[in-house]
Amino acid sequence: MTTTPKPLVLMILDGFGHSESHESNAVYAAKKPVLDRLCASMPNGLISGSGMDVGLPDGQMGNSEVGHMNLGAGRVVYQDFTRVTKAIRDGEFFENPTICAAVDKAVDAGKAVHILGLLSDGGVHSHQDHLIAMAELAFKRGAEKIYLHAFLDGRDTPPKSAQSSIELLDETFKTLGKGRIASLIGRYFAMDRDNRWDRVAQAYNLIVDGQGQFNAATAQEGLQAAYAREESDEFVKATTIGEPVKVEDGDAVVFMNFRADRARELTRVFVEDDFKDFERPRQPKLAGFVMLTQYAASIPAPSAFAPGSLENVLGDYLAKNGKTQLRIAETEKYAHVTFFFSGGREEPFPGEERILIPSPKVATYDLQPEMSAPEVTDKIVDAIEHQRYDVIIVNYANGDMVGHSGVFEAAVKAVECLDLCVGRIVDALEKVGGEALITADHGNVEQMSDESTGQAHTAHTTEPVPFIYVGKRALKVREGGVLADVAPTMLKLLGLPKPAEMTGTSILVDPAH
């Protein structure tokens, strides 16, 4: 018979890194008595959430999808970014059967190949090198008409940094002698993930019907006109370039984002016959629509890189051992604490319950830096008091989502709100004898301005993230921990042996070590 759940709570403070620099550091500037007290009195240290330590290229900043995959898997997960880059380097990409089938069908009928994707070197949702490779693939397979519909970043990159990326793609098309950038739009519209269909509709109508609010002779001119309207990359309004292009019946469309969460909505508009979230002017009958990776199992389109399966991730292993678990987050990070933390699995494991708290409906989260954290905390405190679960896994979105706004004062408020929430959870746990681990998936809010450009720093960082144990046991934190070590640490606290698939090792060790 299992004992009464104590619970063990894993708090993931999204985008909450540690920087030795105090410049533009919202974590340093915030009044955070609870976290300060825990760091002074509890076993704690820093762990890595970027680069090779999470299965990304060396020096690449971490992100929420990658972070949660590693946290939940208990092993370093080879990321889609790295898989695609390697396939391009090895030449396998240019023979990819799924992409080639769609491109060849369009080419044989004398039709166009449309490339969609985030044009950026941010490496979080996409990489411009992948877009270049796709243009080269289309050219090599005989496409006469190659159109890039570029989504601009300014979020995982500096707010006004798209010019160099546009120049690079213009140069690529010039070298190939075929193809061009057909449209520009900010990711705010094309890559929504919060069912703001009015935004997605603007991107869809731009791509499919060549309907933009603005037109420019070249992509460079289109970008400069947007800057003159005081739009940073993320918010560039729908702009057609040159003679407006439409997606015609028989064309092929390849979506080159490798990260799923912000590619799903636009993809659904293209491929779902019964799509009803807004009135489509038309749905082209395509030679093929290819997702670079599987954006969701329910989307009726093939993917170029099929998902790898992860066995015995934390959620699965807890279920097999008869443990109950709660996953809870607000809308912005719900997919991360469920789908990504479960290794790319949509449905809950046996004994797993989920609570989704709606994110506030504001244009940008600097307008409401507390987001829905207080409501999330209410639910967790209630669950702890009633001892309903063995394990509670929560994501707090504030550090990341407010960090992305680039507004320092709001970021400080976000950190201060988090401190209050952590305090409430720790107090509730003390009353029932529970334990907690506090960590993050990657950095962001600890660097709010870019010293080299003087612009707001809206992107993630490569900084390490905190790791704090909250409980009564005499344990110490070892050096060199990574996100993949968090699940094995939780199993140690729960008294469960680690499955063979988990190659991570506990960050908490006995003081004798």
Curated annotation (Swiss-Prot):
A Pfam family reported for this protein in Swiss-Prot or TrEMBL: iPGM_N
Molecular-function annotations in GO: manganese ion binding; phosphoglycerate mutase activity
Catalysed transformations (reactions): (2R)-2-phosphoglycerate = (2R)-3-phosphoglycerate
Residues given in the record as Mn(2+) 2 binding sites: 14, 64, 441-442
GO biological process: glucose catabolic process; glycolytic process
Listed pathway(s): Carbohydrate degradation; glycolysis; pyruvate from D-glyceraldehyde 3-phosphate: step 3/5
Active site: residue positions: 64 (phosphoserine intermediate)
Named cofactor requirement(s): Mn(2+)
Cofactor mode of binding and number, as noted: Binds 2 manganese ions per subunit.
EC number: 5.4.2.12
Keyword entries, A-Z: Glycolysis, Isomerase, Manganese, Metal-binding
Positions annotated to bind Mn(2+) 1: 400, 404, 460
Uppermost EC category: isomerase
Family in the record: Belongs to the BPG-independent phosphoglycerate mutase family.
Function: Catalyzes the interconversion of 2-phosphoglycerate and 3-phosphoglycerate.
HAMAP family: GpmI
Name of the protein in its database record: 2,3-bisphosphoglycerate-independent phosphoglycerate mutase
Species in which this protein is naturally found: Pseudomonas fluorescens (strain ATCC BAA-477 / NRRL B-23932 / Pf-5)
